[in-house]
Design a protein with these regions (language model features):
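An N-terminal assembly and electron-transfer interface module characteristic of large anaerobic redox
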Residues: 1-179
Length: 179
């Protein structure tokens, strides 16, 4: 005799809510990619005396809706600029994207939702962000080009946004090979 499965479960169903226990900061950066977060943290560490406060978080720690809610209420609600780089687009972190968009519009927070894949833009992320497409493209170019100087430029752009300025800096092209 065969029994039909009447329920299903995914790996995300097994995720427990957690509290990241982060203090609020003016600038927030989130990504699923450790290399993104390490590059941003290193660039901030080199210029911390002249940049606004920064917190970074890995999105794998914010998969449970209760974790997202707690983090938004205790950390994101106090930010001036929030940058999120998403692998898989809006649907891979839908609840977080929607909650951040609502918060950003209510509080006037600069919100940049950027694609993590190799594509020029993501229409849904652009629509959900509070920044214009040209500013999102400038921020994304820093990740596309990569390297310490572009992570420093990214933080300068974020610092400007935290001060209410438009994004003016541009990513510096990095040679694909050689010097």
């Amino acid at each position: 005799m065969h029994l039909l499965a009447t329920s299903s479960a995914t790996l995300d169903d097994l995720v427990e809510p957690i509290d990241l226990r982060q203090a609020p900061a003016d600038m927030l950066a989130l990504s699923f990619t450790d290399s993104d977060l390490a590059g941003i943290a290193a660039a901030w560490g080199a210029a911390r005396d002249r940049l606004p406060s920064l917190r970074v978080a890995n999105l794998r720690d914010l998969r449970h809706p209760m974790s997202v809610d707690l983090w938004i209420d205790t950390v994101a609600a106090h930010a001036k600029v929030i940058l999120v780089r998403l692998l898989g687009g809006h649907d891979w972190w839908r609840y977080g994207c929607d909650r951040l968009a609502t918060l950003a519009r209510e509080k006037g927070i600069a919100l940049a939702l950027l694609p993590g894949e190799d594509r020029p833009s993501d229409e849904r992320l652009t629509e959900t962000s509070t920044l214009p497409a040209d500013e999102l493209a400038a921020l994304l170019a820093c990740f596309r080009e990569g390297g310490p100087s572009n992570m420093a430029a990214l933080l300068e752009m974020m610092a400007g946004l935290a001060r209410g300025e438009k994004v003016r800096a541009k990513a510096k092209p990095v040679p694909k090979a050689g010097f």
